[in-house]
C-alpha cells in the first residue's frame, strides 16, 4: 500500500513540476502572439551576401525582442518548393514570414490570400514581379531598392581611385543585379569623364548565384587581360572573382553587405576596395518592429534608397565607411557624391531587365552576355 502511495505521490509531483516548468516558459517574456520564419530563395544563409544579411538581421531582432524565430530552406529552386516551405512554416504556427528575393512573387500570390492573419515581409519583390492584374493584399509588405545608386557610387569611386580596367560579373540578370550593373557603368563613365581618363569595362552574367571552376576560368582571363577590379554582384558568385584575383593581385568590389571582412580575410588583405551595399537587415528590423512592437504593419511596395544627404549610415544604399581603404577617393569625396545624388544634381538611370539596356551602346563597355 505504501508503495502505491509513494508511486502516486511521485506522479503528482512530476505533473506539478511539468506544469510549473510550462508556466515558467509561458511567463519568461517571450512573445506569445508572433513567431517569425524566414524562407530563402536561390541561396542559403551562408552566402555572405543577400540571404545571410537578411537572416542575420531577422535572427538578431528576434533574439533581442524575445520572438521565436526559425529558418526554412526549400528543397529545390522552384516555386512549388518555395510555396511548400512557406506553408510548412505557417502550419507550424509562424505568422510573420520574411522572404528575400524577387522569386517569391508567385509564392506570395499563392499563399498570402489564403492566410490573411499571416504577415509577409518581402525584399526585392516589385510590382513587375507579380501577375499584371495582381492586387497586393493587406498582409503583404514589399521593399525594393535603388541598387543603381549603390552601383553608381561603387563605379564612380573605383575610377576616381585610379582603376581604368574594370569588370562587372553579375549573378543572374534579375532586376536587382541589372540595376546594380547599370548604375556601376554609369558611375564609371561619369568619373572617367570628370578625370579625362580612358577606361574599359567588361560586363557579363554568370547565369547563377554561385562561383565554380568554369566561372573562375573566365575571371582568370579577365584579370589576365589586365582587368584590375571586378564588381562581383550576386550571392556566392564573388568567390570566382576572388579566386582569380588572388593570382594577379587583383581587386574586387563586394555587394549587398560590407564583404571586405570575408574577402580580405579569406583571399587577400586589401582585395576588397569597397562594397555596394543595401540595407537588408535594416529593412527587416524596421518592418518587424512596426509589425510586432508597434502594430503598424503597412501593406505596400516601397522603394528604398537615399534618405539623407549627410547621415550616410541612415541610407538604404551606400558604401561602407567603417572599413574605408581608398586613398584617392576619400570619405569626404563620398559625402559630396551622396549629397549630389540626394539633391538630384546627378541622376542615374534604372532598369529592371537586361533587355531594357543595350550595353553595347554604352561607352567603354564590352558586353559579353551570359557566360553559360
Label the predicted regions.
Residues 9-10, 188:
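Prokaryotic Sec-type signal peptides and long signal-anchor helices
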Residues 16-19:
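C-terminal motif of bacterial Sec signal peptides marking the signal peptidase cleavage site
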Residues 1-4, 8-9:
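Positively charged n-region of N-terminal signal peptides that target proteins for export
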Residues 23-372:
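A residue-level marker of the well-folded mature domains of exported/periplasmic proteins
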